[in-house]
């Protein structure tokens, strides 16, 4: 595991945490699915850093002993957007990362690492960082959601269910759903660019929720928030 970075643009840095995994081992996305734990980043102790925001490349949907995991296999690079407190002075990024490495068994891992961010010059890690940034979903503006996505409630289902149709120019290969604590949603592809979204767990007496959806494409992915109202007569079990 290592930290890499390139010289700043307009005083802001692009760094990244790179994890290389052996064999068939995996590590998890921010929403790990039915198994696993998400990575936890901390930048406490950094010098001349106003903020550091971790970006998450789109994961793969993987089978882990019969459970669905949203994870990465082989290698993953998490971009980190860094804003210096004083852009005229050097910045030192200190990172603690707690994560899991899973193959036949899961092992907790922890990395403590620091990097003096480069202030100028060409970085040998530029291509790796740009490749990772290209795998991060693009936030979809609220004004664009209606034209690119159709979400329709399905009646007569045992559990609350919606059909999600993607109308973007690029094909959608997968859909991931994130929800507040107490909620859980399953997603499955039915036909090209069409998915079912099913509420598997609902807190008692709750009828509305904002779900964060990630539409994964082969070349470009998007993420957006979708307000949902539970269809009448349906109930998660």
Protein language model annotation of sequence segments:
Residues 1-237:
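Extracellular/lumen-exposed scaffold segments
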């Amino acid at each position: 595991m290592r930290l890499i970075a390139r010289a700043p643009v307009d005083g802001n840095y692009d760094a990244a945490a790179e994890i290389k995994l052996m064999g068939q081992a995996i590590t998890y996305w921010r929403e790990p699915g039915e198994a696993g734990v998400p990575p936890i980043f901390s930048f406490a102790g950094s010098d001349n850093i106003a903020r550091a925001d971790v970006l998450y490349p789109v994961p793969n949907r993987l089978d882990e002993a019969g459970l669905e995991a949203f994870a990465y296999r082989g290698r993953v690079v998490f971009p980190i957007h860094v804003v210096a407190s004083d852009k005229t002075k050097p910045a030192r990024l200190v990172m603690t990362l707690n994560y899991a490495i899973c193959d036949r068994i899961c092992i907790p891992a922890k990395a403590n690492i620091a990097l003096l961010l480069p202030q100028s010059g060409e970085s040998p890690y530029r291509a790796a960082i740009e490749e990772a940034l290209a795998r991060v979903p693009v936030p979809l503006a609220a004004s664009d959601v209606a034209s690119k996505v159709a979400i329709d409630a399905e009646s007569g289902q045992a559990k609350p269910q919606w059909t999600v149709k993607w109308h973007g120019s690029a094909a959608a290969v997968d859909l991931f759903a994130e929800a507040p604590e107490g909620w859980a949603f399953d997603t499955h592809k039915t036909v090209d660019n069409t998915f079912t979204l099913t509420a598997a767990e609902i807190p008692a007496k709750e009828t509305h929720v904002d779900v964060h959806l990630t539409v994964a494409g082969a070349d470009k992915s998007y993420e957006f928030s979708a307000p949902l109202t539970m269809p009448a007569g349906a109930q998660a079990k």
